[in-house]
Amino acid sequence: MTFSNYVREKTTKNLSDLNNKELYIQLLNYVKEEAEKKELNSDKKKVYYISAEFLIGKLLSNNLINLGIYDEIEKELAAANKRLSEVEEVELEPSLGNGGLGRLASCFIDSISSLGINGDGVGLNYHCGLFKQVFSKNEQHAEPNFWIEDNSWLIDTDVKYTVPFKNFSLTSSLKRIDVLGYKKETKNYLNLFDIDSIDSSIINEGISFDKTDIKKNLTLFLYPDDSDRNGELLRIYQQYFMVSNAAQLIIDEARAKGSNIHDLYEYAYVQINDTHPSMVIPELIRLMTENYGIEFEEAYSIVQKMTGYTNHTILAEALEKWPLEFLEEVVPHLVTIIKKLDAVIRSKYEGEDIQIIDKYNRVHMANMDIHFSNSVNGVAYLHTEILKNSELKHFYELYPEKFNNKTNGITFRRWLEFSNRPLAAYLKELIGDEYLTDATKLEKLLAFVDSKEVAAKLEEIKRENKLILKEYLKETQGIELDENSIIDTQIKRFHEYKRQQMNALYVIKKYLDIKNGKLPKRKITVFFGGKAAPAYIIAQDIIHLILCLSELINNDPEVNKYLNVYLVENYNVSVAEKLIPATDISEQISLASKEASGTGNMKFMLNGALTLGTLDGANVEIDELVGRENIYIFGKESDEIIKLYETAGYVSKDYYNKDGVKEVVDFIISEDLVKLGNKERLERLYNELLNKDWFMTLIDFEEYYAKKEEMLADYENRDLWLRKVIANIAKAGFFSSDRTITQYNEEIWNK
């Protein structure tokens, strides 16, 4: 049935009679009904991809593309004088994730479904997400990010589980979202657990709330502030609630297919996405021993055969360690299992650094994952090598066979087919549409690397995308973009290791250059996007600096003809879908050795931006694929950085005192900025750079500045620049999440 006929049947109206909100609700229901007709993937073994976050983005467009009806719907609406892009704007973006971890999980479940693999996502149904970012007085403020409406993609189910805590139990309710594969007759689910007693009225000013009222707050927020005891306890409540539900679901579904639990590993594989779901290991063991009479040794060996751990970071702060007393306060029944697992390891191996419970009585989640899984993977070649040779070296020596690399990927359906419609249409005309299911087919573009005609068309498409971004930012943020400028973009959660502060120093130097009469050949627009965790003070200070610089520069008539700076408010997937296709320079400038992979680098590459980056994360593989002539690499390499950490060999003042650096850093506390901002914040950031600079901003600053200047010069040589653009798009196929998931499936889940 066509959509027009569907609407006529449901409402007795024509498409032209409905407003955009009404059209959205009708389209939502139409797509949900189409999805309902799909059979579930049903292989004997099922993958459970457990993740604290899924940054799924808006689903209407994604589902229309995967159903193969996007163009058809667009034409039907156009015939009724309606625009699908305007209908899409009605949808609220689900607040189920924050950064790269959640976006990766979303690309992965898309690929799992598109490849016809039997595999579901499992997480929590957060009502307010991380937070909605609002700027006021050049500072970030946090508000609840409500997104659940009466009409949404969530499907209610009758599935309920009892989750036991020390002093009470909670009954969960399961909501599902259909995960449609690209042009597939089958589907999977994203399983999101919730409680019916959630109460958003307990939220006070901003996003503060009573962290002790678990029955009302449990699924309110993603990553609630854990800077105090109650916050840490709430995180444990959340994580256990997620994994207990997951474990019960896994066992129920396996039993329904004939498992006797002794053979559970033949029916299920659990992929632990970072350390947040780690308690699924002891919880599965607990359920097997308590409910099914399986001996402890057999139970942990079953779990070991059906569990894999993906490590996403080498930052010690992100490898979770929970005080044993906190776990005893929340889930004492699980502590019994954890202590037994710790005893198993102590009976086999010496060495404090590999134990599950350390001498300070902290439970190391990553250590437990590594011991009691059969796979440990990093997410880019360099990251995995650092894990094996440095951060997890002791474990690699124990279990070399467990360690493997699975370089991250992105779904081209969302990050090209939807977000860059002009480029996708041209690629199909030029090389066909096979790349949507076999991304390596993008290499056919290499035949056109010297084509002036193709280069001219790509330039035209980039300009079209800049105009789309211009209209979007004017409507949503009041930003006036100059579409003739070079667009230089850094979009990531705010963290010192990602070094937004180094980019801010570049902006200061460029500002001072312009004030001194050194003018760029073409205007540059620098975009930042991302949120800082409310408890992460220095990250908030970096945001404050950028907002002050933005106010200063954009209102200075001497400078704003040549330079604009914007921090996009409440950056999310929807903003990324507009910003990435319009970008010329992709900022991937983390301190070498600190970024596990990154996926923004892949999205920019696919959409025709050139990378300015360190040899970190997946930048290393981009460099190898495109060749050094098609990427802009700068900075110290990971081996040297790791040695500097080992020897405490980096002293920021040595770099601060160099010509051209001192003036730039000192500008942070200049009168020009202080009068626009908060003196305490600016001085704190200044002192951090001067006296600590843990992530070595100043070590790479001069090289970074010089390399960006080289990029700006190369941009003026349009033939050279566009040749590099074609080479980057052509080589982006390796970074398809379909490739990543095929490797997971063949080398881990069904090994």
What are these regions (language model features)?
Residues 1-751:
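A conserved ligand/cofactor-binding region detector
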